[in-house]
């Protein structure tokens, strides 16, 4: 993937477009700085320039001066002033808030150093649609239990958590399962203990470490060599500590690592490829996950079609993959970090042998969905769908059509269809004119 020039990067992957689409939490510090800068300099696009600045000043960024910035080749007075003005504005609001005693506006040290559930990049993430989905559920469905059978990031379950007495999350990716365990599980854990371990990890200097499995394979590609050493060291250390950790503490540390990795990965948000001519962000920093408050929760990592045969619920939310993008392949590095089996890797993208390949990403998708719907023991089915079946990208072509879903659900009960204009992840070849997100709601007869 040669993306040395900003114009070579698909629009949806550029900082401004991603900010508008997914919000600030989906962007790294260098992405946010790129938006402030607006444009690059001779021979260096804005993302490369922003990464260079963040990498150079690191944690001292908020204390830089115009003279500091002018020492970077190509940075003129105007760009230096843009950055310093933005920093000064933030400091001014912070200081004024503190002097007026508005402590509610100022995050505590621990809150400031935390990860929210939605703070990661993920294809098909429903974070910006969660309120819309919830509003329809409130109006159209009733019951006490909610099953998110293809839970993905878990943001839909998080949004409805206060509405239901029981939440059931399922996803067959090891990395998503780990995230649910950290954010949703009600197991015992010592927050101070995990916080101090994370602080210990954040003090590590990658230059002091030897190369390891992770740095030898992914350093200088998906991550800087230094960050890759830290990632590998931390993952090894978490495993060494496992006997002294509760299950919840173990997954809190694993999830903190996964989210930290996502923030600095030299990619567009997945691991199907990496940028070959873009500077790698070298600001590795773990944070504590902020738990989701839920009354009762069950967490599974199973084939959805098998789980459907034995776990009942009042409402099931179904959001399977509809195209050929295999999530186990797109997020193979996160899967490896959770399993920590250090597999043999293949190809330019450095992927392990195939595992957890979904039938919903194949021509069998329609039959698998029909089987799932038939076997579910629920009162209401809620199905998300988007119209990328008109895509020019082969990987985005839907394996199931709108009409096929409607036909499958009609056999189960009366169905209503809701729609909303919404733009999804795009590799640059899809025409998003009139693009919509659909929500099917079926009351089982």
Residue spans of the language-model regions?
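Charged, compositionally biased N-terminal leader segments and the immediate start
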Residues: 1-35, 48
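S-adenosyl-L-methionine
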Residues: 105-147, 155-162, 186
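Conserved proline-anchored active-site loop of SAM-dependent methyltransferases
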Residues: 133, 147-160, 169-173, 309-330, ...
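Class I S-adenosyl-L-methionine-dependent methyltransferase module
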Residues: 166, 172-291, 328-362, 367
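Conserved SAM/SAH-binding loop
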Residues: 301-306
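Conserved Class I SAM-dependent methyltransferase catalytic core
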Residues: 359-413
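Class I S-adenosyl-L-methionine
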Residues: 399-445
């Amino acid at each position: 993937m040669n993306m040395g020039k900003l114009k070579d990067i698909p629009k949806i992957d550029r900082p401004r477009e991603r900010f508008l689409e997914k919000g600030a939490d989906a962007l790294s510090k260098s992405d946010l700085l790129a938006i402030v800068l607006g444009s690059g300099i001779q021979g260096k696009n804005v993302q490369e320039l922003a990464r260079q600045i963040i990498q150079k000043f690191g944690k001292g960024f908020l204390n830089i001066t115009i003279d500091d910035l002018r020492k970077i080749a190509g940075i003129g007075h105007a760009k230096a002033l843009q950055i310093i003005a933005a920093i000064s504005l933030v400091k001014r609001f912070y200081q004024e808030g503190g002097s007026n005693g508005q402590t509610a506006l100022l995050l505590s040290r621990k809150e400031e150093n935390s990860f929210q559930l939605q703070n990661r990049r993920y294809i098909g993430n429903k974070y910006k649609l969660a309120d819309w989905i919830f509003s329809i559920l409130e109006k159209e469905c009733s019951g006490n239990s909610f099953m998110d059978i293809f839970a993905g990031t878990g943001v839909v379950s998080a949004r409805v958590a206060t509405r239901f007495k029981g939440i059931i999350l399922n996803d067959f990716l090891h990395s998503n399962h780990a995230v649910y365990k950290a954010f949703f599980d009600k197991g015992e854990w010592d927050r101070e203990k995990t916080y101090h371990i994370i602080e210990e990890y954040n003090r590590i200097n990658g230059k002091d470490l030897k190369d390891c499995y992770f740095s030898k394979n992914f350093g200088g590609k998906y991550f800087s060599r230094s960050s890759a050493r830290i990632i590998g060291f931390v993952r090894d250390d978490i495993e060494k500590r496992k006997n002294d950790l509760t299950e919840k503490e173990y997954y809190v540390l694993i999830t903190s690592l996964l989210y930290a990795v996502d923030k600095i990965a030299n990619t567009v948000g997945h691991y199907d490829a990496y940028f070959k001519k873009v500077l790698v962000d070298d600001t590795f920093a773990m944070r504590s996950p902020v738990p989701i408050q839920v009354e009762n929760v069950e967490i599974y990592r199973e084939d959805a079609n098998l789980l459907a045969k034995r776990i009942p619920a009042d409402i099931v939310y179904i959001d399977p993959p509809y195209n050929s993008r295999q999530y186990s392949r797109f997020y193979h590095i996160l899967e490896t970090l959770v399993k920590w089996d250090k597999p043999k890797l293949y190809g330019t993208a450095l992927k392990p042998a195939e595992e957890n390949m979904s039938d919903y990403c194949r021509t069998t998708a329609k039959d698998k969905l029909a089987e799932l719907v038939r076997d579910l023991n629920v009162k209401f089915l809620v199905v998300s769908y988007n119209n990328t079946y008109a895509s020019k990208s082969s990987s985005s072509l839907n394996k199931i059509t709108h009409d096929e879903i409607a036909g499958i659900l009609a056999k189960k009960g009366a169905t209503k269809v809701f729609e909303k204009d919404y733009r999804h992840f795009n590799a640059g070849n899809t025409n998003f004119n009139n693009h919509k997100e659909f929500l099917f709601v079926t009351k089982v007869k």
